[in-house]
Regions:
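N-terminal onset of structured domains
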Residues: 1-275, 282, 297
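Short, low-complexity, glycine-enriched hydrophobic/amphipathic alpha-helices that associate
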Residues: 277, 281-301
Length: 301
């Protein structure tokens, strides 16, 4: 995870910058949502002395947006950190600036069990020198799941749901505590026992210090005389006691509620991502978690 770029706005002979991200302990990912992102900014002086006024890290996400012209793609900077500055970098010298910053709780998950989910996250380093600012190339950022996120995705995989895709949607989900200007959707193919009722299920995690909001949306199948429609609901879970819960049973209950209890949703209300969701479910089931790491469509039978 290294990028290097000559700071062109400073002219030939300007300083160069390398930013190296550390892997989180016990994980191949750089960090998890709400966790620390650590690393080092390596600076190498150019042909003359430069006053480094500010070193800034910017978190970037590639998002999709629905517009009148159709689906558009673009990038969003969703967090900035000043990690150094206020010193002179002498010609031809090197300096290392270590940093430790905290990712937003709603930072999307970009990989599961080391496998990329297909979304683009990155860190961009900006150097402010003598009134000029120059941004480096995007350094890929790998973000793994929180324990509760991993447990829920693993349970969905054990139930027979398969991973299809993941993307970042620009906009806000009504009725939630969403903070970022976009949200992640993880699209799953239905488990065999639900294939008659839904075409796919989409999962969105909105993490916060106390736990997760889990938004489930089902693209329901229509019959010969009834159109299909979207059904959705929201659940909340804590970051605590993740290992002691029977996640397969709990998540299966969520899906059953989504498919069965929300079946009439499309007949009396229109759906949009700006409409409030139904009340959350706070169910808790004590049980044994077998620790088998499968995840949706990743190694499941």
């Amino acid at each position: 995870m290294v990028f290097k770029r000559l700071l062109g706005s400073l002219g030939v002979g300007g300083p160069t910058v390398d930013t190296v991200l550390d892997a989180a302990p016990g994980s191949g990912s750089a960090a998890v949502p709400g966790g620390a992102l650590t690393g080092r900014v390596h600076l190498k002086g150019g042909g003359s002395d430069f006053d480094i006024s500010e070193i800034t890290l910017e978190l970037i996400a590639r998002v999709e947006a629905e517009t009148e012209e159709g689906e558009q793609h673009g990038t969003v900077a969703f967090e900035r950190y000043v990690v150094g500055g206020g010193f002179r970098l002498a010609a031809e010298t090197e300096q290392v600036v270590p940093f430790s910053v905290v990712l937003p709780w709603e930072t999307p998950v970009s990989e599961l069990y080391g496998q990329p989910l297909g979304i683009v996250l990155g860190v961009r380093t900006e150097l402010a020198v003598a009134g000029a600012k120059d941004k480096g190339d995007l350094d890929p950022l790998a973000v793994g799941p929180l324990p509760a996120q991993e447990a829920i995705l693993e349970a969905l995989g054990q139930l027979g749901f398969g991973f299809r895709s993941a993307d970042l949607e620009y906009g806000r989900i009504g009725g939630t505590g969403q903070q970022l200007p976009f949200y992640q959707e993880i699209e799953l193919s239905p488990a065999p026992q639900y294939a008659h009722a839904v075409n796919e299920i989409e999962v969105t995690f909105l993490a916060h210090p106390g736990g997760l909001e889990v938004v489930l949306e089902a693209d329901k199948r229509g019959g010969m005389f009834t159109p299909g429609h979207d059904a959705l609901t929201r659940f909340t879970v804590s970051h605590e006691d993740v290992a002691s819960r029977d996640w397969a049973a709990e998540v299966d209950g969520w899906v059953r509620q989504l498919v069965e209890h929300r079946a009439a949703y499309g007949t009396h209300a229109s759906y949009g991502h700006h409409d409030p969701y139904a009340g959350g479910h706070h169910g808790h089931h004590d049980g044994h978690h077998d620790g088998h790491r499968s995840g949706p469509g990743m190694g499941t039978a």
